[in-house]
């Protein structure tokens, strides 16, 4: 007994020692993760990053962190108009050529100056990536003119090229640092953004530190820590206890509670994203258009919007939302149970069938799936909800392991090319975005025309036609264009919502 007691004491003392001597990633915010002062911002989000390599994944939890580490050639203003970032200016000698003039004196986090060779390396690396190459599809040449000048040529005119170059994944990397890190670059990133990488404790936190030589000036807050806190109730508790300064994407009763608490500030506004129910059209019975149509007529969006989102959003109807240029208000599907049953019978399922829906470990999507489960039961579909960890969810839906799934998509470039091409082009099936594995030659042709048409009105007509076809083909059912929200402690100032839902911390202060 004494030996066991002695062993227990030894274990406890060892654990206390380890906590006291925690690694570098913990020292900046304390071993508990609690905020230690004005020099540190602790942010709670609902999922861990998949990779900090911008060319390795295109997911929101990763983008929230990467937008602090990297800059791009272009940025967008609040109206979605392209603005200079690392490219100071540009000119178009013809419809298929853009010459970019780079800012001088921009430093990477390893101390090297950004040069045209880094831009060429970065764009060519993005073009070679199966995850993000589709964003730059059509570029056929990147040429270094001198240290601060780069020429980009395209096969055909690219109407959205400046918008696409603003995409968070099209970051400019240090060629030297990227090659030195090799396959480990995603865990040891080097960019030229306002914050540099310090550490990543997988599943828990990513720690960043202000970069003193940032070309726009050093960020006001020295340290930023992103905490992976899946349950929004736990994010709320973290804010209430003072362990968190900022929390992202709070829904339900927690949001109302925080809205009414004078200690906090709720910032809510529109975004360029939508939440959708996707169908894997590689698998039966989802390859049958009558089945997809039946499911669409079985759904009533209102209980989802009212109960899960507490009214914070509007019913979806098209593949891009009203905050994206080119949106067309196609007719919504209105719940009609008898029509849905008749369509299922025509498809050969008079008694319905068993089905599975994938959601990631996001409470909002789980709650949405529960309502869908109840609604589809009315037409005989017995729906099983499977919760899949975020990284496994992305990998599995890229392979096509799923049946139905709930996911979101943000048209972060504010241009319909990105809002549509990634989701419905035959060329982007899988990881690039088309997780419904939808293929329609007519749509593919129209998408290519939309990419190259420079006349805005003709372009808008092309995207209107695509939206009408998607409404009929239903590779996905658009559930909601949700509002986004962030809740901060009252002493956090200058936080601005990004319509693309990847919030830049540069400029935020803590009093």
Where are these regions (language model features)?
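Ligand/substrate-recognition segments at binding pockets and active sites
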Residues: 345-411, 481-484
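Short, solvent-exposed loop/beta-turn-alpha elements that line the ligand-binding surface or hinge
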Residues: 59-93, 168-192, 197, 213-221, ...
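Aromatic- and charge-enriched surface segment that lines or borders ligand/interaction sites
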Residues: 88-129, 145, 151, 285
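Ligand-site clamp/hinge motif
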Residues: 211-256
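C-terminal motif of bacterial Sec signal peptides marking the signal peptidase cleavage site
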Residues: 17-20
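Append "and occasionally in soluble cytosolic enzymes with long acidic Gly/Pro-rich linkers
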Residues: 267, 287-374, 379, 439, ...
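Alpha-helical secondary-structure segments
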Residues: 116-122, 147-151, 193-194, 221-223, ...
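Surface-exposed binding/hinge segments that line
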Residues: 91, 134-177
């Amino acid at each position: 007994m004494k030996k066991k007691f002695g062993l227990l004491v030894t274990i406890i003392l060892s654990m206390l020692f380890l906590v006291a001597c925690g690694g570098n990633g913990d020292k900046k915010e304390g071993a508990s993760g609690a905020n230690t002062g004005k020099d540190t911002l602790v942010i709670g989000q609902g999922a861990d990053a998949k990779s900090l390599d911008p060319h390795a994944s295109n997911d929101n939890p990763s983008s929230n962190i990467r937008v602090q580490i990297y800059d791009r050639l272009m940025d967008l203003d609040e109206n979605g108009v392209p603005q200079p970032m690392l490219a100071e200016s540009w000119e178009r000698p013809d419809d298929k050529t853009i010459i970019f003039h780079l800012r001088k004196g921009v430093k990477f986090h390893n101390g090297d100056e950004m040069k045209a060779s880094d831009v060429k390396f970065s764009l060519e690396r993005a073009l070679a990536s199966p995850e993000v190459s589709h964003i730059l599809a059509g570029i056929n040449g990147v040429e270094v003119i001198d240290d601060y000048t780069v020429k980009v040529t395209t096969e055909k005119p690219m109407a959205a090229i400046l918008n696409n170059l603003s995409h968070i994944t099209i970051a400019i990397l240090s060629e030297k640092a990227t090659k030195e890190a090799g396959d480990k670059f995603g865990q040891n990133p080097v960019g030229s953004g306002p914050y540099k990488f310090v550490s990543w404790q997988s599943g828990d936190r990513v720690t960043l530190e202000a970069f003193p030589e940032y070309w726009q000036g050093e960020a006001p807050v020295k340290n930023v820590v992103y905490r992976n806190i899946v349950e929004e109730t736990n994010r709320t508790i973290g804010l209430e206890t003072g362990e968190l300064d900022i929390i992202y994407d709070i829904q339900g009763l927690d949001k109302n509670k925080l809205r009414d608490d004078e200690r906090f500030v709720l910032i809510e506004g529109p975004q360029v994203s939508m939440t959708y129910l996707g169908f894997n059209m590689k698998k039966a019975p989802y390859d049958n258009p009558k089945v997809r149509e039946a499911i669409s007529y079985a759904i009533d969006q209102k209980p989802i919007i009212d109960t899960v989102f507490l009214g914070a959003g509007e019913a979806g109807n098209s593949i891009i939302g009203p905050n994206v240029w080119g949106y067309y208000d196609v007719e919504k599907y209105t719940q009609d149970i008898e029509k849905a049953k008749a369509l299922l019978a025509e498809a050969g399922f008079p008694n319905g069938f068993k089905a599975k829906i994938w959601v990631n470990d996001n409470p909002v999507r789980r709650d949405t799936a529960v309502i869908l489960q109840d609604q589809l039961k009315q037409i005989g579909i017995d729906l099983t909800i499977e919760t899949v960890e975020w990284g496994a969810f992305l990998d599995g839906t890229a392979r096509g392991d799923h049946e139905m799934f709930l996911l979101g998509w943000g048209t972060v470039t504010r241009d319909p090319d990105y809002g549509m091409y990634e989701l419905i082009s035959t060329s982007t099936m899988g990881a690039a975005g088309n997780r419904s594995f939808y293929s329609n030659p007519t749509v593919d042709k129209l998408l290519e025309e939309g990419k190259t048409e420079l006349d805005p009105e003709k372009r808008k007509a092309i995207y209107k036609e695509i939206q009408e076809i998607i409404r009929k083909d239903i590779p996905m059912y658009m559930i909601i264009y949700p509002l986004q929200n962030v809740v901060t402690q009252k002493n956090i100032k200058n936080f601005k919502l990004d319509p693309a839902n990847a919030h830049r911390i540069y400029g935020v202060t803590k009093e």
